[in-house]
Amino acid sequence: MLNERAKILLKTLVERYIHEGQPVGSRSLAKFSGLDLSPATIRNVMTDLEEMGFVSSPHTSAGRMPTTLGYRFFVDTLLVVQSLDNEQITLLENRMHPNNPSHLINVTSRLLSDLTQFVGVVVTPKRMGGAVFRHIEFVPLSEKRILLILVTPEGDVQNRIIFTETVYNQSDLIEAGNFLNQHYAGCALEEIRSGLQHELTQLRRNMTDLMNAAIEIGNAALQESSEAVVIAGEHKLFDVRDLSENLSSLKQLFELFERKSKLLQLMELSRQACGVKIFIGGESDETMLEEISVVTAPYEMEGKIVGTVGVIGPRRMAYERIIPIVDITARLLSNNLS
């Protein structure tokens, strides 16, 4: 357990390192800590902190820099979070209009990037209550191949091919599409499946088979696309000295942005948190790269957590400023979606 003096010096060291990007020496610690200590005493405390794994000393410098453990202790114990000023809150409120969910998600990721100058990330919500369609259409491709076209309430279009044992003519396909659009548009596909069981008296058996196949394939297609990662501001990482000096790490990071699956797993962990969660690079495999930290927060729709927002940047980021931006953005997004 650190005593109060060691905590103050560690806090000062992390703050100066975040601000300057250079190892911090005892003279700088004496100046900014507010403690009336001799350089020798400060060096002794730094030696203790280094032995405990909170700081490290590069061979090329007499100063010290925080380790992953040092960052974690700082964030969990020593950090004083700043409040957003009214101008920033007003900017968020004015630009986050709830007129279109897809547009709102894209705007949110760009806002996070603009306000932090790092990468803004939003995991789009999983569809509530199952996959829903606004319009459905069947297009013949060959005797036993049919193109299924599904349009979601958000305007997304999904195309899938249905392979059938039965040959359907053009009028059959139009009839099936019209029936589903007339009776079930706006309903969850799972609800339609059970509803079709009661329509056997009105529909021919082969038509019911076609519709059930469409429901099964359509449901899978919409669930596949029901969650995605929206990323904005990746290019801003080239302006971050800690990252731009290591092209290998930047390449790995951009590969993660391309694949998105690992990033989605990381963001998914945020759903279990009550409020902001911080992943600091080097702590585990979940944080992707040692030089990267991720600040995330879950957001809600109608009282249920449906996604996460986050900022990806260097470990040497101003956590006291980034955390409230992510927190308030998640709250505003929840309000607009609900």
UniProtKB/Swiss-Prot annotation:
Taxonomy of the source species: Bacteria, Pseudomonadati, Pseudomonadota, Betaproteobacteria, Nitrosomonadales
Protein name in UniProt: Heat-inducible transcription repressor HrcA
Annotated signal peptide: none
Family: Belongs to the HrcA family.
Keyword Cell division: no
Sorted UniProt keywords: Repressor, Stress response, Transcription, Transcription regulation
One Pfam entry name: HrcA
Domain of life the protein comes from: Bacteria
